[in-house]
Design a protein with these regions (language model features):
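Hydrophobic transmembrane-helix bundles of small-molecule transporters
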Residues: 134, 156-268, 274, 281, ...
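Central cavity-lining transmembrane alpha-helices of secondary-active solute carriers
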Residues: 48-62, 112-116, 302-314
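MFS-fold secondary transporters
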Residues: 34, 84-89, 104, 178, ...
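Helix-loop-helix hairpins in multi-pass membrane proteins, especially solute transporters
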Residues: 63-196
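Interfacial helix-cap and linker-helix signal at transmembrane-aqueous boundaries
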Residues: 32-33, 64-65, 150-158, 212, ...
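Extracellular/periplasmic helix-loop-helix junction of adjacent transmembrane segments
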Residues: 28-56, 290, 295-296
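Helix-breaking motifs and short loop linkers at transmembrane-helix boundaries and internal kinks
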Residues: 37, 69, 90-96, 158-159, ...
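12-transmembrane solute porter fold
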Residues: 4-20, 25-27, 40, 196, ...
Length: 499
């Protein structure tokens, strides 16, 4: 085997745990909720902090790679990822796990641009480079798609920390391999590093998400929630103005003035919001309501994972034959139909209907995702292709983080509003049981058998009703977005084969 392909194998090996970690916690959410005694809000932060931090860090880490060399960045990111995985596996509380997941995101944000730079510098020939990038994309989508299944397999036999602990030996091996195999790239010391701007971007996103969660949960005084939201909005405004005035901005905000690029970003974010949010909701529904094990839940969701992970070539062919506008709008419409159908489906008595709709959902979401990438890259000027790609990467990570936050917020709010608690619970117990189904499950362990059974029945009924509302809401919003996408992409020319 040539050194080029050995380098690619080493790069892909370090990328695998990063891709898996984006979704591995989805089936672990119920287990984490019970094991750590985390609230519904804490559980959402445990899962979505990874994508939200990564969204703000991936761009400055690319600049850091230019400054110190991408091999050093790859090794440093791998080391941080390994240490953070160990910290996460040993976390005694929800807050320490949230901090560990944030550190994991920092390591992952170093690894992603380093792997891409390694591929670009290793493969000079365009055909080989495209093949290598295709394999990199397949590892990313496949790892994310099968993350819940991997998590389910580990939780079936080991404690919850195993979903993080498995990264440690992998990281040790890949550090040794990459240190020897990956060639050193020259560093460009003059490359500016906008770390402060990245931190302000992350802070603004986290403050806005936190204020939205607090407003819906009623956890803070209204004035304090408004103050946090105002601070986040002010930081985001400062960041945007800074990017517009910079000669070498971290994010080229002027690209958002192009309607097609803006539509592509909206599609990318929406696709990730719906896919990631749906997987998290399904994992809790299957385990808490239908009493499936983590592995059984992962297997039940396999159709959406397989369809989303392997629909790329078909979607690409459809774009070439039918046109970007048609595939983008069609993907949104089919996704909306899938969500509306799943909202009316009983997963216990109608499994085949659920699997069929999930397969359609996975394919349609992935088609919309490919269409978004095509729209962004086709509309961006050639000299700004890298900047457009960076914006697309941010859209993916923000979509993943916001999907967990939005689906989780609507689910929690609806659950709390609809649960009918059995009599005999104290005020503190009633508040705990109304917070989330995970906390209701934890509470049943301290109750008499009859009361525990009544509470579980009430929690399951409320969660099922909330789950249907969330999916129906997502379906309606996708219908509205499809109409907007159809209008905004009206200027995109059809391919010759479609004329």
């Amino acid at each position: 085997m040539s050194r080029q392909w050995m380098t690619l194998m080493a790069i892909l090996l370090v990328y695998i745990p990063v891709a898996i970690d984006a979704t591995v916690l989805h089936v672990a959410a119920p287990t984490l909720s019970v094991a750590l005694g985390s609230s519904g809000n804490e559980l959402l932060w445990i899962i979505d902090i990874y994508s939200l931090v990564m969204a703000g860090m991936v761009l400055p880490m690319g600049a850091l790679g230019d400054k110190i060399g991408f091999k050093r960045l790859l090794l440093l990111g791998s080391a941080i990822f390994g240490v953070a995985s160990l910290c996460a596996a040993l976390s005694p509380t929800a807050l320490t796990l949230i901090a560990s997941r944030a550190l994991l995101a920092v390591g992952a944000a170093m690894i992603v641009p380093a792997t891409l730079a390694g591929i670009r510098s290793t493969f000079a020939e365009a055909s080989q480079r495209n093949m290598a990038l295709g394999l990199w994309a397949a590892v990313g989508s496949g790892g994310a798609a099968f993350g819940p299944l991997v998590g389910g397999m580990l939780l079936e036999h080991f404690y919850w920390g195993s979903v993080f602990l498995i990264n440690v030996p992998i990281v040790l091996v890949v550090i040794a391999i990459n240190a020897k195999v990956v060639p050193r790239q020259p560093a460009r010391r003059e490359q500016p590093l906008n770390l402060l701007q990245a931190l302000i971007l992350i802070a603004s996103i986290l403050m806005l998400v936190f204020s939205a969660k607090s407003a819906l949960k009623g956890q803070l005084a209204l004035w304090l929630t408004a103050l946090v939201a105002s601070g986040g909005a002010a930081m985001l405004t400062w960041f945007i103005r800074k990017q517009l005035s910079a000669t070498r901005p971290m994010v080229d905000m002027r690209l958002f003035t192009h309607r097609i690029i803006l539509s592509g970003v909206m599609m990318a974010m929406t696709a990730l919001i719906t896919l990631v949010g749906f997987e998290l909701l399904m994992a809790q529904e299957l385990q808490f309501v239908h009493q499936k094990t983590p592995f059984e839940a992962g297997m039940f969701m396999l159709p959406v994972m397989v369809a989303s992970g392997f629909s790329g070539p078909i979607a690409g062919l459809l774009v070439s034959r039918l046109g970007l506008r048609e595939v983008a709008t069609g993907g949104m419409l089919l996704s909306a139909f899938s969500f509306l159908g799943l909202a009316l489906t009983d997963f216990s008595s109608q499994p085949w209907q659920a699997w069929g709709l999930m397969t359609l959902l996975g394919f349609s979401v992935a088609s919309a995702l490919l269409a978004s990438s095509s729209a962004i890259m086709a509309a961006a000027p050639k000299e700004k292709a890298a900047a457009a790609g960076a914006i697309e990467t941010m859209a993916y990570e923000l979509g993943a983080g916001l999907g967990i936050a939005l689906f989780g917020l609507i689910l929690t709010r609806s659950y709390s509003a609809t649960i009918v608690l059995p009599s005999g619970l104290s005020e503190s117990m009633a508040q705990q049981a109304s917070s989330s189904i995970g906390e209701a499950v934890s509470l049943t362990e301290a109750l008499p058998a009859g009361m525990a059974e009544a509470l579980m029945a009430a929690a399951k009924a409320a969660f099922t009703q909330a789950h249907s509302l969330v999916l129906a809401t997502a379906g309606v919003l996708l219908l509205l977005l499809a109409a907007g996408i159809w209008r905004s992409l009206a200027s995109v020319a059809k391919p010759q084969s479609a004329l």
